[in-house]
Amino acid sequence: MAKLYVVGIGPGGREHMTFKAVDVIKSCDGIVGYTPYIKYLEGLVEGKEVFSTGMKGEIERCKKAIEMVKEGKNTAIISTGDAGLYGMAGPILELAGDIDVEIVPGVTSAFSAASELGAPIMRDSASISLSDLLTPWEVIEDSLEKAAEADFVIAIYNPKSKGRKDNLEKALEIISRYRKGTTPVGIVQDSGRANTKMEITTLDSVDCDTVNMLCVLIIGNSNTYIIGNKIITPRGYNIL
């Protein structure tokens, strides 16, 4: 029987894909994904059956991938970053029934952004999406409150969109109840891609007007500091 692979392709760009992800995509007969993400597979999908949709087509893509497997085609459904974090792994497993599914991990945007900023995620951390399309805002607020109170480094995904202009401001206000205004914040747009933009600032100086849905924010904990053009969250090693 054919197999369904749920593949995390990293933040974007062939150089950030794992060898496993590349091998799986090359071996599959069918590829399913969000239309803008298919372009990251240039050189890997020629001659294959490719199915893509736009925004809000996640379940349609999952059902199509399962259908292709049932037709006897080894199929890969792709997610940027890691498919198990805000990706396709969950809905595929919920829908797959008895078909053979393998999850192929990828580099998630928070860790890609962290590598560009320095070493801001060296200790306990929390990843929180500000998108309230699938999660009620009250739940997101509660997550922000608890992560900030616990002094986790916080990686914020989906900080802003045309329909969610105020969520980032609300999130920063919640975090500011537990963090000093001088807490380092890294903002990375298009992490891991050719047009990456990066800014290192502080919690009380974040310009929300410059942040968009392509950004990841990493907000330090009480020990995080800036040295030169890097952010560091020390783990506790005796360096001296």
Model-predicted regions and their roles:
Residues 1-104, 207:
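Class I S-adenosyl-L-methionine
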Residues 10-16, 134-137, 199-201:
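Short gly/ser/thr-rich secondary-structure transition/capping motifs
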